[in-house]
Curated annotation (Swiss-Prot):
<dbReference type="InterPro" id="IPR025933">
    <property type="entry name" value="Beta_defensin_dom"/>
</dbReference>
<dbReference type="GO" id="GO:0042742">
    <property type="term" value="P:defense response to bacterium"/>
</dbReference>
<feature type="disulfide bond">
    <location>
        <begin position="40"/>
        <end position="59"/>
    </location>
</feature>
<dbReference type="Pfam" id="PF13841">
    <property type="entry name" value="Defensin_beta_2"/>
</dbReference>
<keyword id="KW-0732">Signal</keyword>
<keyword id="KW-0964">Secreted</keyword>
<comment type="similarity">
    <text>Belongs to the beta-defensin family.</text>
</comment>
<keyword id="KW-0929">Antimicrobial</keyword>
<dbReference type="GO" id="GO:0005576">
    <property type="term" value="C:extracellular region"/>
</dbReference>
<feature type="disulfide bond">
    <location>
        <begin position="29"/>
        <end position="58"/>
    </location>
</feature>
<protein>
    <recommendedName>
        <fullName>Defensin-B3</fullName>
    </recommendedName>
</protein>
<keyword id="KW-1015">Disulfide bond</keyword>
<keyword id="KW-0165">Cleavage on pair of basic residues</keyword>
<comment type="function">
    <text>Has antimicrobial activity.</text>
</comment>
<dbReference type="GO" id="GO:0045087">
    <property type="term" value="P:innate immune response"/>
</dbReference>
<feature type="disulfide bond">
    <location>
        <begin position="36"/>
        <end position="50"/>
    </location>
</feature>
<keyword id="KW-0211">Defensin</keyword>
Length: 65
């Protein structure tokens, strides 16, 4: 029975996404001068992905031309 519980908890841990990569992507986005948001606004450019919880896009305001 204990062995079954161990495999159950290991399978739950295996499905959890790693948090380290999300934190580092948010930091990289901020270094580029952007911010993480669920959706980029019309005047913003999509730089990449943050993948931290629900804030999936790295957005930065476009420079006026």
């Amino acid at each position: 029975m204990r062995l079954l519980l161990v495999f159950f908890f290991l399978s739950l841990l295996d499905q959890a996404p790693p948090a380290r990569s999300g934190i580092s992507r948010v930091r990289i986005c901020r270094e580029k001068g952007g911010h993480c948001d669920a959706d980029c606004h019309l005047e913003e450019r999509h730089l990449g992905g943050c993948r931290a919880a629900y804030l999936t896009f790295c957005c930065r305001k476009e420079s006026p031309r």
